[in-house]
């Protein structure tokens, strides 16, 4: 797990403050694919599935990952907006960024609930519950990595 944490820290720290102004869509796509690949690997290594369970789980997981991926794209746009306005965030922009951040969090929870419910229809709670725990840990690592790479909002001088 330490290797995973270091991997995510490396990925997000590479999006340092100075580099964010020139976001490259290919670079962002590469980071997303790396994160998705590592996330899938972590889930596979930590979730003991029978063949029947795997045949039911992975298609739902892939749908979940695709739905969540759309939120990642929106989160990148919010981060870009934050960085581009970093030296001049007024009340309107600040409130808008906070509103967008809350919206993304609520939508992420809605997506997670939707796919957890789909999994519960075909898999035992022990499998779904463990996946839920793994998924939340991965999300926490990603969030910490992302937050560590962004500067805090400047205070008025």
Where are these regions (language model features)?
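A generic membrane alpha-helix/interface feature
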Residues: 5, 68, 83, 142-145, ...
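General helical structural elements
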Residues: 6-7, 44, 79, 141
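Hydrophobic h-region of N-terminal signal peptides that target proteins for export
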Residues: 9-18
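Alpha-helix termini
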Residues: 15, 61-63, 137
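Amphipathic alpha-helical segments
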Residues: 21, 28, 39-122
């Amino acid at each position: 797990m330490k290797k995973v944490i270091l991997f995510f820290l490396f990925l997000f720290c590479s999006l340092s403050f100075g580099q964010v102004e020139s976001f490259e869509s290919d670079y962002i796509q590469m980071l997303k694919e790396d994160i998705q690949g590592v996330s899938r690997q972590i889930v596979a290594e930590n979730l003991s599935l029978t063949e029947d369970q795997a045949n039911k789980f992975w298609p739902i997981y892939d749908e979940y990952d695709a739905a969540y991926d759309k939120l990642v794209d929106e989160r990148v746009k919010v981060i870009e907006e934050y960085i581009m306005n970093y030296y001049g965030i007024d009340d309107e922009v600040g409130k808008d960024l906070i509103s967008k951040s809350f919206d993304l969090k609520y939508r992420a929870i809605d997506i997670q609930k939707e796919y957890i419910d789909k999994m519960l229809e075909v898999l035992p709670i022990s499998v779904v519950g463990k996946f839920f725990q793994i998924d939340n840990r991965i999300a926490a690592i990603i969030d910490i990595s992302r937050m560590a790479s962004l500067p805090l909002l400047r205070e008025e001088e």
